[in-house]
Amino acid sequence: MKKLTIAWLSAGVSSFIAAYLIRDEIDEFYYIDIDDQHPDSMRFIKDCESALGRPIKILKSNYGSVENAILAQGCIRIAKTGFAPCTAYLKRRVRKEQFELLHQNDEITYVWGFDSTKHEQNRADRIVEAMPQYNHRFPLIEQGLTKQDAHAVLRRLNIRRPAMYDLGYQNNNCV
């Protein structure tokens, strides 16, 4: 059995900064590419790779896009909760099929980019409850950092944030 610490980058600032803060403790970095991400997301991932000085492995769902996942699975976005079931098919399923099955006998620690706000702390608690078979690290929460703090660290690293933020979005999710 191997012990692995894995960071899943979302192409968002918070997930990158969380990984960056404990980069020397992380064995592998991953990004799951989705066709519907803004084209600038890949530039950001490459900039993150340069800052980390380590490769970021890129995985991709066979569905490719949100539309394909919706058509194949008949899922829709639930506006009230903000939950997009397509995320389950484009990210979670990829993680399970392309990573977790290969490492099912290993001790895995996942690094997450949730910040220190109460809402994000609640999300972290739900992750721990939903995935008890893994260990979890939340560097932004551990260091009391907010999303704004993460953006400030990114500026100090002289990395341009993903274009979706400059278009007024709070996160760098699908377009």
Protein language model features and the residues they cover:
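Nucleotide-activated chemistry modules centered on ATP-dependent adenylation/adenylyltransferase
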Residues: 1-175
